A protein has these predicted regions:
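Short acidic capping loops at alpha-helix termini that bridge into adjacent secondary structure
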Residues: 26-29, 89-91, 117, 200-201
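Rossmann-like NAD(P)(H) cofactor-binding subdomain of soluble oxidoreductases
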Residues: 15, 37, 47, 56-136
Length: 264
C-alpha cells in the first residue's frame, strides 16, 4: 500500500515515522509533502527511502491512501489543489484534522457527483512513540479497505473503527485523556515531593506504577474495581487513601472533565 501524507508537522511527521518503523508499509511507499523543506529534510535524514516533496499533487499521484495532516483552515485549500489529481475509483482520502466531520469533508471532495472512500482518523500524541489510541470513522469504503487501515494504525498503538457519533466521547477519552493522565502524574509527583521524595524519583515511581497497573488490567481483563479490591485490605492504607480521594471528588472530577471536553 502506498500512502501520501500531506503535511509534515507534529501529527504528519509522527505518522510518517511510525509507518517507516512498521512492517506493513514499505518506506519507499511513503510520500510526504510539506510547503517548507526543513521538516522534509529531517525526515529524509532519518529515513532516506521516504519520498519527500513540496508538491502536494506529486505526493498523491500514485498513493492508495491520501492522509491530510494540515491545519484545519488549510483543508479546503489543499483539497481544491489535489482534487483534480485524485482518482476516486482507486484512492481513499483520510483526514487527521480535528473538528471535521464526514459531511464537510465529503462536500469539499465532491467532483462531478463522485466521492472517494473517506476516513476520519483521530490519533493522540502518543503516535509519536507508536502507542496511540486511534479512532477511525469510515464512509463509502470497503471492508477490505477498513481492515487494511486499522491494521496499519494498530502498528502505531491500538486502532478502533467507530461510528462518527461516537467520536466526541472517544476523543475525550483518548486525545484529551492523555493530558488528563499527565495531570494525574503531575499531581502524584507533587504529592511525592511533599512526602519527601525527590521530584525525578517520584516521576519514575509514578510512571512505572501506571505501566504496571495497565499491564495487570490488560492481562486479567478484569474490571478495574476487581483489581482495586485485590490491593485494599480492611483498615489498610490503600482504602484510606482511596476514600480520601473520593471525598475530594476524584471520580466526579474525572467524569466532569470528560463531559466538558466533549462540548464545543
Amino acid at each position: 500500500m502506498k500512502i501520501a501524507i500531506i503535511g509534515a508537522g507534529n501529527m504528519g511527521g509522527a505518522l510518517a515515522r511510525g509507518l517507516a518503523q512498521g512492517s506493513l508499509v514499505q518506506t519507499s511507499d511513503i510520500y510526504v509533502s510539506n510547503p517548507s523543506t526543513a521538516k522534509l529534510e529531517a525526515l529524509k535524514g532519518e529515513y532516506p527511502n521516504i519520498n519527500t516533496t513540496t508538491s502536494n499533487c506529486d505526493a498523491v499521484a500514485t498513493a492508495d491512501v491520501v492522509v491530510l495532516a494540515v491545519k484545519p483552515w488549510k483543508v479546503e485549500q489543499v483539497l481544491d489543489e489535489i482534487k483534480p489529481h485524485l482518482d476516486y475509483s482507486r484512492q481513499a482520502v483520510a483526514s487527521m484534522v480535528g473538528g471535521l466531520d464526514i459531511e464537510q469533508l465529503s462536500a469539499w471532495l465532491e467532483k462531478g457527483g463522485a466521492l472517494p472512500a473517506t476516513y476520519l482518523i483521530m490519533p493522540n500524541t502518543a503516535i509519536a512513540v507508536m502507542q496511540s489510541m486511534t479512532f477511525i470513522v469510515s464512509a463509502r469504503s470497503t471492508a477490505e479497505q477498513d481492515c487494511a487501515l486499522v491494521d496499519i494504525f494498530n502498528e502505531l498503538g491500538k486502532a478502533m473503527l467507530i461510528e462518527q457519533s461516537a467520536m466526541p466521547a472517544a476523543t475525550s477519552l483518548a486525545s484529551c485523556g492523555i493530558a488528563y493522565a499527565f495531570r494525574y502524574i503531575r499531581a502524584a509527583m507533587e504529592g511525592g515531593v511533599e512526602l519527601g521524595v525527590r521530584a525525578d524519583d517520584a516521576k519514575h515511581i509514578v510512571m512505572q506504577t501506571l505501566r504496571g497497573a495497565v499491564e495487570v488490567l490488560a492481562a486479567s481483563d478484569a474490571h478495574p474495581e476487581a483489581e482495586i479490591d485485590r490491593v485494599t485490605t480492611p483498615g489498610g492504607l490503600t482504602i484510606r487513601g482511596l476514600n480520601a480521594m473520593e471525598a475530594a471528588g476524584f471520580t466526579h472530577s474525572v467524569i466532569e472533565g470528560l463531559r466538558a471536553s466533549t462540548k464545543r
